[in-house]
Amino acid sequence: MASQIQKLLTTNQDLLLMQKGTMMRKVRTKSWKKLRYFRLQDDGMTVWHGRHLESISKPTFSISDVERIRKGQDSELLRYLVEEFPLEQGFTIVFNGRRPNLDLVANSVEEAQTWMRGLQLLVDLVARMNYQEQLDQMLREWFQQADRNQDSRMSFREAQRLLLLMNVEMDEEYAFSLFQEADVSQSNTLDSEEFVQFYKALTKRTEIEELFENFSSDKQKLTLLEFVDFLREEQKESDHSSDLALKLIDRYEPSENGRLLRVLSKDGFLSYLCSADGNIFNPDCLPIYQDMTQPLSHYYINSSHNTYLLGDQFCGQSSVEGYIRALKRGCRCVEVDTWDGPDGEPVVYHGRTLTSRILFKDVLATLAQYAFQSSDYPLILSLDNHCTWEQQKTMAHHLIAILGEQLLSTTLEEQLIDIMPSPEQLRGKILVKGKKLRTIEVVESDKEEEELEKDEGSDLDPASAELDMQSQPESQEQASGNKSKNKKKFLLQSSTTILCPDLSALVVYLRTAPFCSFTHSKENYHIYDISSFSESKAKNLIREAGNEFVQHNARQLCRVYPSGLRTDSSNYNPQEHWNVGCQMVAMNMQTAGSAMDICDGLFRQNGGSGYVLKPEFLRDTQSSFNPMKPVSLYKAQILVVQVISGQRLPKVDKTKETTVVDPLVRVELYGVPEDTKQQETSYVENNGINPYWGETFYFQIQVPELAMLRFVVKDYSRTSRNNFIGQYTLPWTCMKHGYRHVSLLSKDGTSLHPASIFVYTCMQEDLDMDEP
């Protein structure tokens, strides 16, 4: 693949023009538009820009950091500048994670097309690289960085600089001995092939060699039977382990003769352990593997709070980009706060703050385009409506006109009224969640009508409560006097009606309802009534009535949202709300941190569909489960985690070439309160390339079905807080035991390949302190 890129750099016309460089306009805001010189570097993997051709600057971004290229027509920012620049001359570079997009305007349509085609070609090539090809590319980049005089050879001084780039501080005498061993030509320099041998010596995996030799009778190879023993005893691959061993040998043994003899060499063994088959995340959990035909209330649903915000809650930017990013992350419930806007057009923003505004119809157009790109399971549009009657009519018109057949506007045929539809039944549909005027038939089935309370938005926003009071349906006493009238008509209210029937009619299965008590909800609400809770209210209910909360959530949906005091868009721990079966635990997805890592970890499974089936005891309306007083169906288990080693950890501060990390690993367990705990290794001084810890931890787990495991690697600091290096979070139910690699992710959730840690995990019935 790497050679293919090098070939394309000399033959592809788009890439040739990109290597010559192009002056383009970089656009950050409506007023910030600067000319910059962009050029694809000779390695074909990095792009830099400067004020002019002679600018001295480092590469601005790597092709591996780019997710996709968008046309100018799809850029919210460039559309605002259509009178200044033709949209056909613009394009957007979309990066992985939360890194801001890069909007560019070329001097001509042809120039824009050249860069769009060329960049997308390289992005697609990188996406198809396997582990070895990615490693080859990384080695090539390191060699080029170390070869300061560009003579295609590396001196020992350049090799010393490389060690610092690779995040390792090594004794000079030992480093020189490795350098001499690799210098087969005895020229006191290394060519590219000799450099590969130098790299292998630097990254020698002694711990894996020892593991290999423990199962190999001749210390040179694993026979088929020896490999089967390893898979069965250590990797817990008890089912069809013989067939699996054959497949893995065919897949990872580099020697054709070894494959014919059905043996695995040391290199093949290492390739297996570093592959997806040797990863801690069970590959069987990556596609859709759960039953998707159960009622919506039986699933955790990946949910976003104030989806339109890219920053804080007070003066942050509102943008349709927030919806695109959330949907890209697998979000299946987005929030839309609507307010009256100019020219009769509703706008979306965080009301009574300084956040910017976007048009409601632009949000809908974005949802129509991106709703089902990452998941085709139903998308819930959580509507927080603050508009007047007239603009609500406009909202209803836009919902129907823009979303078209994607919008679920009527109940499903042959769907029982007392059972919520399933994700499978609702595939490809957008559901509106919001307030709904009640019909006489519904009122008659209710024992009483309660005064509506505030149920959505910020804890500090009185407007919602005011709206709810105004849109309150008439009391049961008033309703009884109207029984002779047409039952399909909406009820008149004692005060001026605020909620528009046109908009109300589009709320089909997801009607918001104020929460009074669990008893009231059970006796008065239907399965399609949804109550919303602030995080603090939900926490109180969990502490005071955990089991009732579990039963409530087995029967109907609920939504939890962050406190309005979180003006910085920080997040709360979703785990404690999942523990009682809350389905829609809304997160500020624009904010990285441990809370979002836990959220991403849960929804990484099941095809990234945004729907995860809750454990059986959280789907039973008669469940006796209480997370505050868990009684395990089985004997408490012991999770054993041995943190063995780390590989190619990135620098915390890449601008400081001479600094090297002192890494440590913290293992965090999240679940019911009794299971939540963490343990930490000691730190390894000055080694980011192959640190070794070899420390073992024991975690007692009462409710493994709810447990989440998070590995965090940090750079130890004596004077301040330890700096974040990388992390990986996964559900206990998706964890493969045995010797596994944990692929690290950045704060933004993007891959830090090839950075990883090597661990051993297993489950024990009784606490046995012997080393695994």
Curated annotation (Swiss-Prot):
Binding positions (Ca(2+) 2): D183, S185, S187, T189, E194
Start and end residues of each C2 domain: 619-746
Motif stretch (GBA): 213-243
This protein's domain notes: The PDZ-binding motif mediates the interaction with GRIP1. The C2 domain mediates pre-localization to the membrane prior to Ca(2+) import and non-selective Ca(2+)-mediated targeting to various cellular membranes.
Name of the protein described by the UniProt record: 1-phosphatidylinositol 4,5-bisphosphate phosphodiesterase delta-4
Ranges annotated as spanning the membrane: none
Induction: By serum treatment.
Role description: Hydrolyzes the phosphatidylinositol 4,5-bisphosphate (PIP2) to generate 2 second messenger molecules diacylglycerol (DAG) and inositol 1,4,5-trisphosphate (IP3). DAG mediates the activation of protein kinase C (PKC), while IP3 releases Ca(2+) from intracellular stores. Required for acrosome reaction in sperm during fertilization, probably by acting as an important enzyme for intracellular Ca(2+) mobilization in the zona pellucida-induced acrosome reaction. May play a role in cell growth. Modulates the liver regeneration in cooperation with nuclear PKC.
InterPro entries: C2_dom, C2_domain_sf, EF-hand-dom_pair, EF_Hand_1_Ca_BS, EF_hand_dom, PH-like_dom_sf, PH_domain, PI-PLC_fam
Superkingdom: Eukaryota
Tissue expression profile of the protein: Present at high level in testis. Also present in brain > skeletal muscle > thyroid gland > stomach > thymus > aorta > heart (at protein level). Highly expressed in regenerating liver. Isoform 4 is weakly expressed compared to other isoforms but is expressed at high level in some neural cells.
Domain PH: 16-124
Record-annotated PI-PLC Y-box domain positions: 503-619
Localization per record: Endomembrane system; Nucleus; Cytoplasm; Endoplasmic reticulum
Organism of this sequence: Rattus norvegicus
Enzyme class: hydrolase
UniProt-listed SMART domains: C2, EFh, PH, PLCXc, PLCYc
